[in-house]
Amino acid sequence: MLTKKEQRLRRSRQTRIRIANQGVARLSVNRTNLHIYASVISGDGTKVLASASTAEVEVRNEIGGSGKGGNVAAAQAIGKRIAEKAKAAGVEKVAFDRAGFAYHGRVKALADAAREAGLQF
């Protein structure tokens, strides 16, 4: 029987295969208990076009100091920031890769904030 983490990794592999076949840039999200990370990766998967995380100093100052990167408000800030960086890199449309995480809580907050900031997926 697969563990919960192995099941999540299997789901993420399948998603990445489907996205790679589309050939569109992907917005990849990873979360830990303390931080949330987002990156926009090129359609062929060779280059990171934009990235943002709560581990960045500017973001930590914006969200209110250290140790506050694992909440919904921080995820919203990262969603807005990744959308701005992606648009600056010339990317308007992406495929959302939630890496097997449930579309709920911090992952959903990041996605909604990125959509509101103008990223299409």
From Swiss-Prot:
The lineage of its organism: Bacteria, Pseudomonadati, Pseudomonadota, Betaproteobacteria, Burkholderiales. One of its GO terms (molecular function) is structural constituent of ribosome. PANTHER family: 39S RIBOSOMAL PROTEIN L18, MITOCHONDRIAL, LARGE RIBOSOMAL SUBUNIT PROTEIN UL18M. This is one of the proteins that bind and probably mediate the attachment of the 5S RNA into the large ribosomal subunit, where it forms part of the central protuberance. This is Large ribosomal subunit protein uL18. Part of the 50S ribosomal subunit; part of the 5S rRNA/L5/L18/L25 subcomplex. Contacts the 5S and 23S rRNAs. Pfam families: Ribosomal_L18p. CDD domains: Ribosomal_L18_L5e. It comes from the Bacteria. One of its GO terms (biological process) is translation. GO terms for cellular component: cytosolic large ribosomal subunit. InterPro entries: Ribosomal_uL18_bac-type, Ribosomal_uL18_bac/euk. Belongs to the universal ribosomal protein uL18 family. Keywords: Ribonucleoprotein, Ribosomal protein, RNA-binding, rRNA-binding.
